[in-house]
Amino acid sequence: MKNRSYLKEYELDSDVKKIRFGKIGKILSLYENINEFQKPTIQSIRENLRTGRGYYIEKDKKIVSMAKSTAESTTHAMIVGVGTHPMYRNKGYATKCIVKLCNNLINEKKKPCLFYDNEDAGKIYKKLGFKEVGQWVIYYV
């Protein structure tokens, strides 16, 4: 990720809030509305927040977009759970959440990394400065 100047454009966006444990129910509701996501448990969301962090945008009293990290180390963090409710897409909400998350990670000298299989999401990541370093395949047994 190199395009730090683009990331700074969104840095002061007050719509983006940090996910707290009290918001887990609303996060679960968002997951239920995004077909591309597997449905997590409350416990798995809690565990994810213990090993990472997340940011969200709330509209109409519901969380409509989010981006999270997990498996943070002293040098890297995996970006996960980037998604937006279908009724609120194409408004830049996921981008704002990713930017907030990445800015915080970069300020802590951590490199954000991610996997994606959605080409539309890939376009956002590339626009933000992520670079492809390889491809991955999942084999099922």
Question: Which positions does each model-derived feature cover?
Answer:
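Acyl-donor-binding surface of acyltransferase catalytic domains
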Residues: M1-S14, Y139-V141
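A short beta-loop-alpha structural element at the N-terminal edge
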Residues: D13-I27
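Helix-loop element at the rim of GNAT/NAT acetyltransferase active sites that forms part
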Residues: K26-Q38
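A conserved beta-strand-loop-helix scaffold within acyl/acetyltransferase catalytic domains
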Residues: E36-G83
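Conserved acetyl-CoA-binding loop-helix of GNAT-fold acetyltransferases
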Residues: V80-P86, N90-N107, K123-K127
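Conserved GNAT acetyl-CoA-binding A-motif
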Residues: L105-D117
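Conserved active-site alpha-helix within GNAT-family acetyltransferase domains
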Residues: N118-Q135
